[in-house]
Amino acid sequence: MSRVGKRPVAIASGVTANVEGQTVKVKGPKGTRSFTVHDDVSVELKDNVIRVAPRFETKRAQSLYGTARAQIANLVEGVTKGFEKKLEITGVGYRAALQGKNLQLSLGYSHDVVYPVPEGITITVPKPTEITVAGIDSQRVGQVAAEIRGYRPPEPYKGKGVKYANEFIFRKEGKKK
């Protein structure tokens, strides 16, 4: 049995949840999201609490219902608080700027990298060396942050590149004479 799946998902005030068959729809102050649960998992809404349980005692159902509960919890958190990832840019001349709906990154290449901001994602640049990616879908926020980081991942010698704000870069010692 999944320890994550056993816990119920509480619906916060100001959020409405609706379960229709295998689809869970959540509407909150930041937007609307929906998630379709696998057929091996049953979903039940009672008293502003969503409970998830496996329909069968198979290994697949056991493994899927904890995941389904986590996804539903992310739906509720996304429409209430939203998700945010912060990126830092380190390096001489490395910087970021927003130009319309594009993020322009100067990362030491011969040309600037232009990243189009996807729908449902908000990117802000408080400083030229900081990028904040926000949205209501945790998977998309993480994916966009990973794509931006992928243009110039931090290198282990000087630490130059794009890294997550809480990421630690293991430094290597340079060549010895």
UniProtKB/Swiss-Prot annotation:
Any one cellular-component term (Gene Ontology): cytosolic large ribosomal subunit
InterPro entries recorded: Ribosomal_uL6-like, Ribosomal_uL6-like_a/b-dom_sf, Ribosomal_uL6_a/b-dom, Ribosomal_uL6_bac-type, Ribosomal_uL6_CS
The UniProt record lists the keyword Secreted: no
Keywords from the UniProt entry: Ribonucleoprotein, Ribosomal protein, RNA-binding, rRNA-binding
PROSITE patterns cross-referenced by the UniProt entry: RIBOSOMAL_L6_1
Gene Ontology process terms (BP): cytoplasmic translation
One Gene Ontology MF term: rRNA binding
Top-level taxonomic group: Bacteria
Keyword Ligase carried by entry: no
Subunit structure, interactors included: Part of the 50S ribosomal subunit.
Protein purpose: This protein binds to the 23S rRNA, and is important in its secondary structure. It is located near the subunit interface in the base of the L7/L12 stalk, and near the tRNA binding site of the peptidyltransferase center.
Sequence similarity: Belongs to the universal ribosomal protein uL6 family.
PANTHER family (UniProt xref): 60S/50S RIBOSOMAL PROTEIN L6/L9, LARGE RIBOSOMAL SUBUNIT PROTEIN UL6M
Protein name: Large ribosomal subunit protein uL6
Organism from which the protein derives: Afipia carboxidovorans (strain ATCC 49405 / DSM 1227 / KCTC 32145 / OM5)
